[in-house]
């Protein structure tokens, strides 16, 4: 069997499926990853704030 030279053409169906997969992945990124990063950022800011504030003398 001979191998084809160059890139193999993508059919319309394959291209459509790939685009749908990319849209699903982007939706997951927006609904899972970004909120998780937001929570981590809030914890980091809170941690730094609590560690750098002056001690309260009782």
Swiss-Prot record:
Top-level taxon of the source organism: Eukaryota
Coiled-coil annotated spans: 1-31
Protein name per its UniProtKB record: Single-pass membrane and coiled-coil domain-containing protein 4 homolog
Family indicated by similarity: Belongs to the SMCO4 family.
Subcellular location: Membrane
Database matches in InterPro entries: DUF4519 (IPR027960)
Disulfide bonding pattern of the chain: none
UniProt KW keywords: Coiled coil, Membrane, Transmembrane, Transmembrane helix
Membrane topology of this protein: Single-pass membrane protein
Primary residence: membrane
PANTHER family: SINGLE-PASS MEMBRANE AND COILED-COIL DOMAIN-CONTAINING PROTEIN 4 (PTHR34644:SF2)
CC terms in the record's Gene Ontology section: membrane
Residues passing through the membrane, by range: 31-51
